[in-house]
């Protein structure tokens, strides 16, 4: 999501009419010649017949897209004498229509952030993108509607005030969800597991028969997700803006994304890629949730590609001359039946063979399972109409726990317990002797991996945070261990 500054250099000389663009432009950049020529003419200006050479520096980096139309036009207009010399700390971005209108482009937020880092003080962008760019403080964002207005602004014939936005108003947004946890009957232990997952950013797998409410619980999970911090909101918005999925009426995304891809999804669509690399579903779920329903129905090779991103929280896409890295710090919430027929462990009769169940479960590999906290939906719980808490009440507890974590990790580059490194685990997950013995016994009995050992401590830390406790108690650890015990039941017995 990082960029670089491109300087548009133009040389206009007498001679046979000729126009060449150099500096590794792609086809869309080369096509800018015709758009720019028409836009200048249709803005009431003469386009002289000259020999024109345009260089996009640095020349060793490929230039793609229609972002360069407006800066190319301004560079030529300065050479033609229609516009006075442009300041070094002023940048331009925008696509031109043939009639001179400045059209919106994708990725303005990321562009403005990078422009500020590179010392740009003012940037001229399409009017439709101005609100998005104005989210970045410390840089003046000027929105223009057409080329004529841009020329008049540069020549001091008109005044255009920098765009402003009210960030507090953007975050003041009533939370609306299609499913409230209070609408879901029973399932208290599953709701508890999902509350822990939301509070600590942990991954969760729900196993249960068809009709037990797994999908509804996952959709309800969106209603208890913690608020986005401003830095998280910026990162989420950048990714959606780059691929044109940012709502026009919402220049800043203030709610955590919830992505729900179909089980037929391809690897590039899930992970990211393509001829022109784009973020995949895991990056669109950054700082939010990726929900995979009917997990074993996904292609096994597709699921295995999640292992690296789940561990690294970023994904790299290699191309011939470059490597593009996208963030993918998401919570994985998955759901599946306990067997092919779906009735294993329920009150209904299971018609599957032992071999059939083992083959079905083997679609989820051990290394992938190690990255997921596991829970089981018990059929009997559906009939228990226990006290139902509203999502709003649960969300308050989740927000409080997340704020505790943000304060704890304020000097680190992480946001939640699930992101703790081994050194942070050692620092913040200290156990007393009784708890140490419990964990040692569970580790040996369940034959857990070293990664699972750390996962238990991370979950225990979150459970303690929900109690607003500085220390992990024996009961916190015992509850965390139970979320690891079910994976061995289903994958070993």
Regions found by a protein language model. Give the residues of each.
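Peripheral, non-AAA+ core regions of ATP-driven protein-machinery
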Residues: 1-205, 209-215, 253, 318, ...
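Basic, amphipathic alpha-helical bundle interface domains used for macromolecular binding and assembly
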Residues: 22-33, 48, 55-65, 276-277, ...
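Short loop/turn elements that form and flank the Walker-type P-loop nucleotide-binding site
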Residues: 47-50, 86-87, 117-119, 137, ...
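Residues immediately C-terminal
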Residues: 98, 290-291, 297-298
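P-loop NTPase nucleotide-binding/switch module
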Residues: 158-196, 200, 227-282
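Walker A/P-loop
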Residues: 205-247, 312
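Walker B catalytic acidic pair
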Residues: 287, 293-295, 305
């Amino acid at each position: 999501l990082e960029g670089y500054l491109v300087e548009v250099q133009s040389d206009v000389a007498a001679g046979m009419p000729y126009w060449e663009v150099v500096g590794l432009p792609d086809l869309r950049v080369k096509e800018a010649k015709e758009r720019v020529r028409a836009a200048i003419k249709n803005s009431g200006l003469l386009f002289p017949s000259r020999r024109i050479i345009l260089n996009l520096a640095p020349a060793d980096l490929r230039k793609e897209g229609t972002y360069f139309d407006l800066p190319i036009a301004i560079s030529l207009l300065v050479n033609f004498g229609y516009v006075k010399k442009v300041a070094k700390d002023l940048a331009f971005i925008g696509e031109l229509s043939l009639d001179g209108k400045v059209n919106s482009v994708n990725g303005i937020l990321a562009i403005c952030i990078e422009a500020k880092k590179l010392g740009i003080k003012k940037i001229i962008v399409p009017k439709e993108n101005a609100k998005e760019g104005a989210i970045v403080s410390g840089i003046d964002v000027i929105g223009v509607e057409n080329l004529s207005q841009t020329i008049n602004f540069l020549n001091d014939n008109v005044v255009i005030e920098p765009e402003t936005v009210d960030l507090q108003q953007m975050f003041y947004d009533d939370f609306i969800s299609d499913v409230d946890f209070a609408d879901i009957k029973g399932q208290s232990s599953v709701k508890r597991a999902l509350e822990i997952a939301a509070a600590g950013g942990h991954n969760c797998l729900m196993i249960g028969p068809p009709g037990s409410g797994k999908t509804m619980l996952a959709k309800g999970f969106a209603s208890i997700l913690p608020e986005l911090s401003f830095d998280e909101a910026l990162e989420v918005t950048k990714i959606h803006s780059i691929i044109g999925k940012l709502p026009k009426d919402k220049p800043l995304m203030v709610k955590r994304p919830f992505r729900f891809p179909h089980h037929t999804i391809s690897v590039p669509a899930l992970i990211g890629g393509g001829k022109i690399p784009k973020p995949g579903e895991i990056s669109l779920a950054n700082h939010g949730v990726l929900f995979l329903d009917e997990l074993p129905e996904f292609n096994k090779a597709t699921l295995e590609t999640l292992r690296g991103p789940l561990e690294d929280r970023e994904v790299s896409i290699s191309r011939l001359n470059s490597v593009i890295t996208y963030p993918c710090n998401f919570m994985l919430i998955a759901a599946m039946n306990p067997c092919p027929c779906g009735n294993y462990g329920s009150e209904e009769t299971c018609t599957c063979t032992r071999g059939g169940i083992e083959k079905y479960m083997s679609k989820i590999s051990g290394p992938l399972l190690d990255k997921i906290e596991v829970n089981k939906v018990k059929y009997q719980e559906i009939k228990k109409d226990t006290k139902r808490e509203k999502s709003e009440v649960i969300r308050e507890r989740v927000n409080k726990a997340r704020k505790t974590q943000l304060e704890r990790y304020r000097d680190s580059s992480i946001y939640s317990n699930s992101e703790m490194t081994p050194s942070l685990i050692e620092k913040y997950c200290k156990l007393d002797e009784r708890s140490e013995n419990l964990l040692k016994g569970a580790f040996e009995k369940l034959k857990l991996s070293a990664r699972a050992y750390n996962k238990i401590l991370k979950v225990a830390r979150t459970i303690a945070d929900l109690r607003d406790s500085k220390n992990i108690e024996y009961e916190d650890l015992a509850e965390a261990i139970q979320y690891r015990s079910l994976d061995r039941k289903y994958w070993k017995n």
